[in-house]
């Protein structure tokens, strides 16, 4: 499986958070899966940290990049085709970072690992299910 981690998913995987469903944890731990994180997620975190909306500590982005390198999570750059895909998306919601992740998943045929309920509205494959969900 080729999977794109949403920004919150990356933070929760790094933190080994109990907010992660077992299915997502299993996907992230399976060495047969190719995992990706968008450079847009690093951009989003940088903006949120600079605005004081999230506190991750000094050098957080460098630490996250090192964690990605150590765990074979590939950085996904933003391409022109991703930008063109964003332009065609309906406006189910307006978060520009989410819209870019959706475009990247669609263009690069990636499954999104995200708790965001809006993603499925765009026809992208999303995995996020807690065992209590049925």
Locate predicted features.
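Phosphate- and divalent-cation-binding pockets in alpha/beta enzyme and binding domains
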Residues: 44, 85-88, 121-122
